[in-house]
Structures are given as structure tokens and as C-alpha cells.
Amino acid sequence: MTDKNNESALLLRMNKEEQVSVLQEIGFTSVNENTPASDIAKYIRWAGGLLDLSFATIRIEDGVNVFFTAEEWNSLSANNRSKYLRIGVRIRADRRQFVIAKSDCTDDIGGRTFKWGAYGTDIRGVKNYGNGNQGLYETADGKQNTDAIIEATAGVKDNSGVVGAPAAEAAKNYKACTLELDGLEDKTEWYLPSEGELITIAKYKTEINELLSSVSGNQNIITTDWYWSSIEYDSSNAWCVYMYYGYVNPYNETYAGRVRPVSAIESLSL
């Protein structure tokens, strides 16, 4: 068995009090002694590597986020579907959960790549990760990094002549829906993913793309190109993931890469 399967088997052998304690430590803060045993089993499966994908939507009536499995979405009538706007895909896997935007960022003229910016600047509040640093794969601080990057570079021209932080700004300003086009303004707090979040996307790219393409064809799938993360390697390079092979590499901040924003879901839940 894999390490994760071993971990799940160990959890299943514990009594409920012990299971609750371990799951709370992992991050399932809503789990308690009153949680049904059937839900405990689902949490344990997730802790052991369960992949769960669903459509992330905004209900037009009140702006609340609602999530649908593919089966649930497909079972809705056209009239009921019209009550929701799809904004992306919620992924729950490897003890993470977040929403992946339904499309890559584009600029004002339709361009799909952005420079990272801040070339030659070591940004305060954004930790550098060198080669071989295993902590890179666990990073989940994309929103914090995005905010720090934008604050530090606002109106500042870097050593290559780039003003600001185009990739982080594109992620922050992303809108999955607008008042003008859709009748509802997207107020989701999007950000440039951490490398850990981007690696999770790469790991499950095939499954994510299957869900995306089931409703919009191939126009908005995760491509095979390089995608920026919000994690720096040093003052001149930031980490990327090459989605074709899932390679993880630092990329010069003067180069242009794709941006797929994500949004946090604060507490782990079923």
C-alpha cells in the first residue's frame, strides 16, 4: 500500500475520539464528537488522498457560492442552471481545497501570458525557496504572497523596465463574471497560486480538464504551457510548473508565463 493508504488504514483502526483529534490537527476543524461516523469515514478517505472535483458557482439570487458535482449539474434543467454562474472548479485533494478559476487570465488585447515582474528585487514577505527545498511542495500561502507582491511593486519599475507585478495583478483582478456581461459582479478573492497549489493542479490536470471541457469544450482547459506561481526562487526568478510534464522549475521573472488564478476555501469540509 502507499503511505497515504497506510495512513488511512491507521486512522480507521482508531477510536472515534482519536480520529476526531487527528482530523482536527490535519485541518478539518469542523469535525467533532457529534460528526456522524459516515462523515468521519469520508474525511479519512480525503486524508488518505481522495480526489473530489465539483463545479464552483455563484447563485445569482444572493451571490452565495454553491458547488455541484458533474452529475448534479447535468441533472439540472436549463432553467435551474440559469440561476447559477460557473466560476471554476473546486478541488479537494491531498488535504487541500481551493477553487481553480474557469479560465486563464487574459490582458486587454487578448494576450494570455504575463511577466512576473520585480526582477532584481527580493520582495519582503515572500519567502524564497531554493532547489531541493521540500517545503516548496507544501506551500499554501498564495493569497498572502500575491498581496505582498502587489503592495511591494505598486508603481515600481524593476531592473528590466517592467512596472509592477503583471502576473500577480492579473490574478488579483481576474473576474469570472461581470455585471455588464452576466448581470452579477464576481467578488471572489482570486490570487496567484502558491507552488504547492500549482503542483496540485498539475497532478490532477487530466481530471480537472475533463470537468472543464464537459461544459465549455477545450477553450478554457489547463494548457501544457508554463504557469506562474507566487513563490520566488531568488530576487530574479520565480517558481513555475510546466504543465505538459508537471516539471517544477524556477523561471526568469522577465519571461512571460500563463496565469490561472485560484481562490481559497478557508476551512476543510466535506
Model-predicted regions and their roles:
Residues 2-22, 195-270:
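C-terminal, surface-exposed recognition/capping segments
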Residues 2-186, 253-255, 262-270:
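Short, compositionally biased
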